[in-house]
């Protein structure tokens, strides 16, 4: 992995070889360039972004289960130093890639797949990339090492769906690295200003990465919200569709406290509706019924004006 500020210095980019040149993500950007050979392969890859605490891990885990119930082989990758993305699937905090690499003094050849990939509920395979110590290192490096390990152990060859659950609303080059592997980036947001403001920044990050990679905006997942009027305003202005809606139900909040996905809880009418929504979303994403969109992020002032702030 290379961190570059000058896009003309990318490997393979010369004045006489312009077809290999890659434009920068934006003026003054510091880019994390992953090894171009580290491609995930034939699996459909989705990255889940959104404001910190908005419910990305809950959304990711239940979406993973929904895909698995469609008969798909699913791998969920948590990209957060807290390494708690998959614990409702595995019922525990599993060791991170960084943890296990450190245990063998970063001699990756000494690792076995079972050292860092764990089976969760309904056969969903779970991995926590982890992250560098606070204030040091780069999350993009961790993502790169994780994909490298998976490829070296041929763990992506039998995978249909990969879901990256990504730290907060950070859109730096490091934590935007999963976008370089993704087909679609989904944005989780609530019906409030802070969540939508973060969503707008994420749209900008996805659009920047889309210049050089195959990732596209997949849509907005409304979460923890009974109403969606503010989200729908934002959706109309940016061209990013709302593709699912999960209301603010106490049963969803409690599912995480119970270390369970929503598909494991006792039946109730309101729970059944949420399960059906996850199954509908997974089906549409798998079948490509939600076409990619060319979302256009708003300027900060436009967000304030749009949502009624003076």
From Swiss-Prot:
Binding site for [4Fe-4S] cluster: 138, 172
Database matches in PROSITE patterns: NIFH_FRXC_1, NIFH_FRXC_2, NIFH_FRXC_3
Cofactor comment text: Binds 1 [4Fe-4S] cluster per dimer.
Enzyme Commission code: 1.3.7.7
Catalytic activity field: chlorophyllide a + oxidized 2[4Fe-4S]-[ferredoxin] + 2 ADP + 2 phosphate = protochlorophyllide a + reduced 2[4Fe-4S]-[ferredoxin] + 2 ATP + 2 H2O
List of residues binding Mg(2+): 57
Protein role: Component of the dark-operative protochlorophyllide reductase (DPOR) that uses Mg-ATP and reduced ferredoxin to reduce ring D of protochlorophyllide (Pchlide) to form chlorophyllide a (Chlide). This reaction is light-independent. The L component serves as a unique electron donor to the NB-component of the complex, and binds Mg-ATP.
Subunit and interaction comment: Homodimer. Protochlorophyllide reductase is composed of three subunits; BchL, BchN and BchB.
Protein name: Light-independent protochlorophyllide reductase iron-sulfur ATP-binding protein
Source organism (scientific name): Rhodopseudomonas palustris (strain BisA53)
Gene from which this protein is expressed: bchL
């Amino acid at each position: 992995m290379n961190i570059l500020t000058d896009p003309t210095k990318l490997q393979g980019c010369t004045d006489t070889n312009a077809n290999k040149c890659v434009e920068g993500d934006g003026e003054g950007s510091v880019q994390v360039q992953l090894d171009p050979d580290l491609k995930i392969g034939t699996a459909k890859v989705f990255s889940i972004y959104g404001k910190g605490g908005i419910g990305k891990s809950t959304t990711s885990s239940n979406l993973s289960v929904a895909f698995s119930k469609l008969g798909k082989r699913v791998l969920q990758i948590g990209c957060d130093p807290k390494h708690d993305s998959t614990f409702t699937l595995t019922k525990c905090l599993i060791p991170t890639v960084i943890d296990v690499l450190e245990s063998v003094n970063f001699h990756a050849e000494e690792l076995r797949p079972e050292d860092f990939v764990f089976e969760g509920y309904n056969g969903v395979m779970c991995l926590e990339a982890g992250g560098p110590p606070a204030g040091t290192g780069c999350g993009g490096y961790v993502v790169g090492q994780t994909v490298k390990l998976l490829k070296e152990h041929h763990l992506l060859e039998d995978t249909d769906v990969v879901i990256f659950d990504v730290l907060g609303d950070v859109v730096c080059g490091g934590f935007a690295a999963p976008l370089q592997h993704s087909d679609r980036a989904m944005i989780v947001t609530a019906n409030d200003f802070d969540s939508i403001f973060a969503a707008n920044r994420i749209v900008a990050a996805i659009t920047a990465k889309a210049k050089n990679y195959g990732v596209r905006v997949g849509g907005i997942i409304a979460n923890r919200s009974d109403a969606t009027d503010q989200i729908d305003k934002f959706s109309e202005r940016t061209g990013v569709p709302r593709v699912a809606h999960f209301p603010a139900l106490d049963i969803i909040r409690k599912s995480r406290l119970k270390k369970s996905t929503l598909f494991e809880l006792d039946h109730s009418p309101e729970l059944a509706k949420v399960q059906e929504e996850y199954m509908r979303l997974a089906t549409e994403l798998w079948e490509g019924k939600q076409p990619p969109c060319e979302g256009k992020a708003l300027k900060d002032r436009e967000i304030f004006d749009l949502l009624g702030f003076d």
